[in-house]
C-alpha cells in the first residue's frame, strides 16, 4: 500500500472551524471600521464570487470608489492570509500527532531509515548524506516583517484552539487576544513603502533561524542518528542537513551586494549562532546543579572547573556549573573577537575546540551514570556545533559570467599580457588563461594602473571572502557560482580572479568553482563544457582538494522562460544524466545544486516528488537546492513545519539514492525517445508564440501588472538586469510573478498540451503508452502532476479580463491562442492521468483552493479596475499603492507565486 502525504491526514473540520472564527472576527472588525453601505458591498462581493457570477462581480467592483477600494482590498488580502495560518497550524499539529501515534506517512524519517538499514552500505549512505537548503533573497516575499510578526502571534493562538475546545484555556481571553491581533493587522501597512536593502534581507532571513532552523535542524539530526542507532548503525559525524545562504553574496544583477554586505551577512550569522550557544550553555548551567558530594566528575572537567572564574562559595562542589561558566566565558570572548575584532579574554580558536569542551562534559556524565542528562538540549547543542560551527550557514558568492570576463580582460590589459582578450576565440582564451594559472605566479592586479569600479568591487569581495574564511572557518564560504556559464573560459576566468586573492593556486582551491547552466542551449552544451574542465590536470587538483566533489548548478527559471515548461524539465533531466555519466568517467563525484523557485514555472512543486523523480545516480550523497521568497515562510515559518519539510528533503534524497525504480531499468530508452519527440514540438510551439509573435511582448506588458511588480518594494534586486526592451531582458521572477497575478500561470503549462495531443493523434495506442509512463516513471508523474496543479490555480475567465487591457485587437487576439492551448493541455493531462477533474490525486490542495479561491478571485477584479483607473490617470500616487496590496493578496492566496 502506498503511503499518504501527511497533509492528507489533516482534520479539515478543525481548519474549517478556525477559518469560520477568523472570518467572523475579520468581518466584525471591518464592519466597525466602515460605513454600513461599504461593508454591505464586501458581503455582496463574496456572494457573487462564490456563485461565480463574474459579470456581476465586475459590475460591482467597477462601481466602487477609490476610498472604498482601500478597505475592501485590505479585507480580501487579509482573509487568505488568515486561511494560510490556519492551514499551517493544522499541519504543525498533524506533524506532532502522526509522529506521536507512530503513523507512517510519505517521507517519514523513521520509515526511510528502516528502508536504508537493509542495504549493505547503509552506514556509508547515512554518514555522508548532506542536503542543503539555500535561502535566497529573491523578491517574491511581499510581506513586511511587522506583518510576519503579527501572523506568528495568530499562529501561536490557533495552536491553542484544540485546548480551548477542551476547556483547558479560557475561551473568552483566547478569543479577545485573537481579535486584538487581527484588528492590529487590519490597521497595519501590509506592504513596504521603501524598497528593502540587502541589510534588511539579511536580518529577515535570520528570523527564520531564531524561530525554526536552530530548533529543527539539530532535532532532526539527533533523530536521524537515533533511528540509525536503533537499527544497529553507528553514525559518527553525520550531517544530513546543513544550511546555505545567498543573501549578501549573490550579486548577479544586484549592484547593492558588495564586500561590505558579504561581511555583514557572515558576521550577522556569526552573531546569531554565538548568541544561541551562549543561551544554551546558560540553560545547561542552570540545570546542571550536580554536586561532587553525590557524583564524581572526570579529571578534564575538574581542570575546566579549576580554570573557571565562577568562584562563588556556593559552587565549590558544583563542578559542572563551574566548567560551563568557563565555556560560556570563552564563547562570549570568541563572539567579541569574531564580530568586533577585539580580544577580551580567553577564547576558542575554532568551533572544534568548543566542541571538544562539550564532549568532555558529555564523557564525564557518561562515566558517572548521567546518561539521561545528555539527551534533549545537551545532545542537540552538540549537533548544532557540528552543523553550524561559528558561521551558521555557508554563504555562496554568485556573479554573471560577463562580469568575470570584463574583469579578467582589464587585468590582462593592465598587466601588459593582452589588450584585446574579449576578442579572442574560445580556444585562445583558454590557452591564455591556463598559462596564467599554471605557469605565472604573479598577481595581475599588483600594478599601479587604476582599476575600474567593477574590477575593484569584485576583487574586494573575493579578498573579504578570504578574510572571512580565515576567521570564521573555511566552510563559511564554500562555493562561488558563475551565472550564465556557457564555456570553459567562463570557469577559468573566475579562477584567475580567485588566484588574485589566494583562494586558488596550482595545487588546491579553497572555494569550489560552480558553473550555473541556465538556458536550454547552455544546458545542451553543459556536457561539452564539463568534459573540457574535468580533462584539465589543474581542475583535477582543485576537485581533489574539495574531497573529489564537483558541484554544478542547474537553472530552472531561465530555461523555462527560454523554452517552456516541458522543454526545461526534459533538458534539465537529460543534462543531469549526461553530467553524472561524465563525472563517473573521470572518477569525480558530480553533485547538483537545483536553482528551483516557488512556482512550477521556476522548478517548484512538491519537494519530495521533485527529488525522487531525479535521474538514477544523479544524487550521490549531496544535493543543494534554493529556497526562495514566500516559500521560505510557508515551509519554515515555525519549527514544526521546518522539521517536516527538512524531513521530506532528507527522506527524498535517501529514497532516490537507494530505490531502484522500474523506469530505471526496464523501459527508459523507449520513454526517453518519446519525450525527445514531444519536447522538440513543445519547444517550437512555445518559442513560436513567445519569441516568434511580434505582438507577444506588447500582450505581456499590457495584460499583466508587470509595471506595478517592477516598482514593488519586495526585494533589493532590480526586476531586470538591464532596461527591458524584450522578453529576454526580463528576469524570470517578475515574468512568472506577472503570469500568476493575471491567473494564466503561463510558464507552468504552455506548450504541453498540443505537443502531447499531436503525439497521441499519430497513433491511437500512444495514449496507452503515455498512461504507462505516468504510472511507472516518477519523472513523468511529477511533471504532469505539477501541470495539473498549475492549471487548477489558473482562471481563464479572469485571464480574459486582463487580456481586455490590451488596446490593439491583434495584441488582444493572443489570448485566444493561450486559451486554446490551456483547454488542450487540461484535456490531455486528464486523459493521461485517467481522471475526470484536476487535483484528483491531491484532495488536500483541492479542498484548500475550493474555500480560498472565491476570496482572492475578487482581488483580481479589484486589481484590474485599479490598473484601468491608473492608466486613465484617476489614481493618486498613494492610491496606486492599492495595486500593490492586491498583488500581495493574490500572492498570499496562491502561496507560490514567484
Swiss-Prot record:
Signal sequence annotation: none
Cofactor(s) it depends on: Mg(2+)
Gene Ontology cellular-component annotations: cytosol
InterPro entries registered for this protein in UniProt: PEP_COase, PEP_COase_bac/pln-type, PEP_COase_Lys_AS, PEPCASE_His_AS, Pyrv/PenolPyrv_kinase-like_dom
Entry EC no(s): 4.1.1.31
Pfam families from the UniProt entry: PEPcase
Entry keyword set: Carbon dioxide fixation, Lyase, Magnesium
Matches recorded under SUPFAM superfamilies: Phosphoenolpyruvate/pyruvate domain
Recorded superkingdom: Bacteria
The reaction(s) this protein catalyses: oxaloacetate + phosphate = phosphoenolpyruvate + hydrogencarbonate
Free-text function comment from the UniProt entry: Forms oxaloacetate, a four-carbon dicarboxylic acid source for the tricarboxylic acid cycle.
Protein name per UniProt: Phosphoenolpyruvate carboxylase
Amino acid at each position: 500500500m502506498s503511503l499518504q502525504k501527511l497533509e492528507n491526514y489533516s482534520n479539515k473540520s478543525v481548519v474549517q472551524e478556525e477559518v469560520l472564527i477568523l472570518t467572523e472576527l475579520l468581518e466584525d472588525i471591518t464592519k466597525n471600521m466602515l460605513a454600513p453601505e461599504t461593508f454591505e458591498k464586501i458581503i455582496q462581493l463574496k456572494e457573487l464570487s462564490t456563485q461565480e457570477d463574474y459579470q456581476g462581480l465586475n459590475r460591482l467592483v467597477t462601481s466602487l470608489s477609490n476610498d472604498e477600494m482601500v478597505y475592501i482590498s485590505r479585507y480580501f488580502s487579509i482573509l487568505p492570509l488568515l486561511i494560510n495560518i490556519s492551514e499551517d497550524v493544522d499541519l504543525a499539529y498533524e506533524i506532532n500527532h502522526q509522529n506521536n501515534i507512530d503513523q507512517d506517512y510519505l517521507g517519514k524519517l523513521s520509515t526511510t531509515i528502516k528502508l536504508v538499514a537493509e542495504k549493505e552500505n547503509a552506514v556509508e549512505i547515512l554518514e555522508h548524506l548532506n542536503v542543503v537548503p539555500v535561502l535566497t533573497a529573491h523578491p517574491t516575499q511581499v510581506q513586511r516583517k511587522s506583518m510576519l510578526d503579527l501572523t506568528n502571534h495568530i499562529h501561536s493562538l490557533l495552536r491553542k484552539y484544540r485546548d480551548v475546545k477542551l476547556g483547558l484555556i479560557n475561551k473568552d481571553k483566547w478569543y479577545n487576544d485573537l481579535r486584538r491581533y487581527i484588528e492590529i493587522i487590519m490597521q497595519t501597512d501590509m506592504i513596504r513603502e521603501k524598497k528593502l536593502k540587502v541589510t534588511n534581507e539579511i536580518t529577515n532571513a535570520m528570523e527564520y533561524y531564531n524561530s525554526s532552523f536552530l530548533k529543527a535542524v539539530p532535532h532532526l539530526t539527533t533523530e536521524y542518528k537515533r533511528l540509525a542507532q536503533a537499527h544497529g548503525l553507528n553514525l559518527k559525524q553525520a550531517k544530513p542537513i546543513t544550511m546555505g545562504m545567498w543573501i549578501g553574496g549573490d550579486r548577479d544583477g544586484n549592484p547593492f551586494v558588495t564586500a561590505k554586505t558579504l561581511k555583514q551577512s557572515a558576521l550577522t550569522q556569526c552573531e546569531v549562532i554565538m548568541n544561541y550557544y551562549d543561551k544554551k550553555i546558560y540553560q545547561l548551567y542552570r540545570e546542571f546543579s550536580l554536586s561532587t558530594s553525590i557524583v564524581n566528575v572526570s579529571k578534564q572537567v575538574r581542570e575546566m572547573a579549576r580554570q573557571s572564574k565562577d568562584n562563588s562559595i556556593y559552587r565549590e562542589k558544583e563542578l559542572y556549573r563551574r566548567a560551563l561558566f568557563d565555556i560560556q566565558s570563552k564563547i562570549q570572548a570568541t563572539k567579541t573577537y569574531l564580530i568586533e575584532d577585539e580580544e577580551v579574554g580567553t577564547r576558542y580558536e575554532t568551533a572544534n575546540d568548543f566542541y571538544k569542551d562539550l564532549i568532555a562534559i558529555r564523557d564525564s556524565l557518561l562515566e558517572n551514570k548521567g546518561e539521561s542528562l545528555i539527551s534533549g538540549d545537551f545532545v542537540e547543542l552538540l549537533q548544532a556545533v557540528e552543523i553550524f560551527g561559528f558561521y551558521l550557514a555557508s554563504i555562496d558568492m554568485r556573479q554573471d559570467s560577463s562580469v568575470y570576463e570584463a574583469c579578467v580582460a582589464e587585468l590582462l590589459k593592465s598587466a601588459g599580457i593582452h589588450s584585446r582578450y574579449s576578442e579572442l576565440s574560445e580556444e585562445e582564451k583558454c590557452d591564455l588563461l591556463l598559462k596564467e594559472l599554471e605557469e605565472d605566479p604573479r598577481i595581475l592586479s599588483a600594478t599601479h594602473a587604476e582599476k575600474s569600479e567593477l574590477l575593484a568591487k569584485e576583487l574586494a569581495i573575493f579578498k573579504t571572502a578570504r578574510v572571512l574564511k580565515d576567521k570564521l572557518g573555511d566552510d563559511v564560504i564554500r562555493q562561488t557560482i558563475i551565472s550564465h556559464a556557457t564555456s570553459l573560459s567562463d570557469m577559468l576566468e573566475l579562477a584567475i580572479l580567485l588566484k588574485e586573492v589566494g583562494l586558488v593556486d596550482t595545487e588546491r582551491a579553497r572555494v569550489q568553482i560552480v558553473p550555473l547552466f541556465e538556458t536550454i542551449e547552455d544546458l545542451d552544451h553543459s556536457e561539452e563544457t564539463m568534459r573540457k574542465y574535468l580533462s584539465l590536470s589543474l581542475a583535477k587538483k582543485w576537485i581533489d582538494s574539495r574531497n573529489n566533489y564537483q558541484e554544478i548548478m542547474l537553472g530552472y527559471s531561465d530555461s523555462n522562460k527560454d523554452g517552456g515548461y516541458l522543454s526545461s524539465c526534459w533538458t534539465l533531466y537529460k543534462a543531469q544524466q549526461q553530467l553524472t555519466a561524465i563525472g563517473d568517467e573521470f572518477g569525480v563525484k558530480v553533485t547538483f545544486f537545483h536553482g528551483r523557485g516557488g512556482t512550477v514555472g521556476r522548478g517548484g512543486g512538491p519537494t519530495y516528488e521533485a527529488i525522487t523523480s531525479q535521474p538514477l545516480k544523479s544524487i550521490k550523497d549531496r544535493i543543494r537546492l534554493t529556497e526562495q521568497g514566500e516559500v521560505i515562510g510557508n515551509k519554515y515559518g515555525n519549527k514544526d513545519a521546518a522539521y517536516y519539510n527538512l524531513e521530506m528533503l532528507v527522506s527524498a534524497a535517501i529514497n532516490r539514492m537507494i530505490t531502484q525504480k522500474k523506469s530505471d531499468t526496464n523501459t527508459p530508452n523507449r520513454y526517453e525517445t518519446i519525450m525527445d519527440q514531444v519536447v522538440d514540438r513543445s519547444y517550437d510551439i512555445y518559442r513560436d508564440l513567445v519569441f516568434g509573435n511580434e505582438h507577444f511582448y506588447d500582450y505581456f506588458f499590457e495584460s499583466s501588472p508587470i509595471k506595478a511588480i517592477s516598482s514593488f518594494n519586495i526585494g533589493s534586486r532590480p526586476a531586470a538586469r538591464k532596461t527591458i526592451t524584450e522578453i529576454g531582458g526580463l528576469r524570470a521572477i517578475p515574468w512568472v510573478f506577472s503570469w500568476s497575478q493575471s491567473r494564466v500561470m503561463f510558464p507552468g503549462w504552455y506548450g504541453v498540451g498540443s505537443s502531447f495531443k499531436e503525439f497521441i493523434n499519430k497513433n491511437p495506442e500512444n495514449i496507452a503508452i503515455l498512461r504507462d509512463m505516468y504510472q511507472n516513471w516518477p519523472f513523468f508523474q511529477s511533471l504532469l502532476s505539477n501541470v495539473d496543479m498549475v492549471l487548477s490555480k489558473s482562471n481563464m475567465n479572469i485571464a480574459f479580463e486582463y487580456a481586455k487591457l490590451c488596446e490593439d485587437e491583434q495584441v488582444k487576439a493572443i489570448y485566444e491562442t493561450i486559451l486554446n492551448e490551456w483547454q488542450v493541455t487540461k484535456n490531455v493531462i486528464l486523459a493521461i492521468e485517467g481522471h475526470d477533474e484536476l487535483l484528483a490525486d491531491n484532495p488536500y490542495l483541492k479542498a484548500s483552493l475550493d474555500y480560498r479561491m472565491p476570496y482572492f478571485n475578487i482581488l483580481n477584479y479589484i486589481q484590474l479596475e485599479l490598473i484601468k483607473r491608473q492608466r486613465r490617470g484617476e489614481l493618486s500616487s498613494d492610491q496606486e499603492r492599492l495595486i500593490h496590496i492586491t498583488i500581495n493578496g493574490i500572492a498570499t492566496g496562491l502561496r507560490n507565486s514567484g
